């Protein structure tokens, strides 16, 4: 569900009202005071139950023609038939999210009751099957990062959210840059995890709300 052409300001006569996508707020937070500070071009991806994202181009939040730029629902694979929460099939979110990790675990273990906790704990303890499941999930993330890097040529991709703490950023960065450098003269991009992203995002939404959702920094 969503709102279009709704006058939120009419709900409050005393305070100015600003409405913005939370992932866009997070992307701007990282750009202003977080892991991608000082980098004019960056992509922020939140890995949680779902996947969110925001794109900074030339120091401006890029929103696209309808405000939907940065939604991580681009199609990953043909005919895999994994249904996404958006209703489509085989979106990046359906593979790269925590929900996607569970689904990958179900498929590889043949256990419908497996949880993300089971997989991460097993991987950390050296269980081979759980490690294989986790690595498969991480490679789904990698495929998305390679595509985004080819499209936007960012200085950095920042991963945040509850699942980001478990990924191997050195592996993701190395493999992403191997793919793009062998096919072009692009400079390498960095991949970072911001484990303090939630507190940073809250601060930026509170302190820089006017700058964030006004016309000052928007494209």
PLM region descriptions:
Residues 1-41, 168-178, 183:
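Glycine-rich phosphate-binding loop and adjoining helix at the ATP-binding site
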Residues 13-23, 77-112:
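Glycine-rich phosphate-binding loop plus the immediately following alpha-helix
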Residues 13-20, 116, 169-203, 210-219:
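Conserved phosphate-binding/catalytic loops in two-lobed NTP-binding clefts
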Residues 25-27, 52, 164-167, 200:
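Short, active-site-adjacent cap segments at secondary-structure transitions
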Residues 28-33, 135-149, 177, 206:
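Generic structural signal for well-ordered alpha-helical scaffold segments
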Residues 37-95:
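Glycine-rich phosphate-binding loop of actin/hexokinase-like ATP-binding domains
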Residues 92-95, 102-170, 188-197:
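Adenine-nucleotide phosphate-binding core of ATP-dependent small-molecule kinases
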């Amino acid at each position: 569900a969503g709102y279009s052409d709704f006058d939120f300001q009419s709900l409050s006569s005393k305070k100015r009202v600003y409405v913005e996508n939370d992932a866009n707020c997070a992307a701007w937070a990282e750009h202003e005071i977080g892991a991608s500070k000082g980098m004019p071009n960056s992509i922020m991806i939140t890995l949680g139950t779902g996947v969110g994202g925001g794109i900074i181009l030339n120091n401006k939040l890029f929103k696209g023609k309808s405000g939907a730029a940065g939604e991580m629902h681009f199609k990953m694979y043909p005919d895999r038939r994994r249904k996404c929460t958006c209703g489509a099939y085989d979106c990046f979110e359906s593979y790269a999210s925590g929900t996607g990790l569970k689904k990958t675990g179900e498929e590889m273990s043949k256990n419908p009751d497996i949880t993300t906790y089971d997989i991460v704990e097993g991987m950390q303890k050296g269980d081979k099957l759980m490690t294989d499941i986790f690595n498969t999930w991480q490679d789904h993330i990698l495929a998305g990062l390679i595509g985004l890097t080819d499209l936007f040529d960012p200085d950095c991709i920042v991963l945040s959210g509850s699942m980001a703490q478990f990924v191997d950023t050195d592996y993701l960065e190395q493999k992403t840059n191997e793919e793009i450098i062998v096919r072009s003269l692009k400079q390498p991009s960095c991949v970072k995890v911001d484990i303090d992203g939630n507190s940073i995002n809250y601060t930026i939404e509170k302190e820089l709300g006017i700058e964030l959702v006004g016309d000052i920094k928007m494209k």
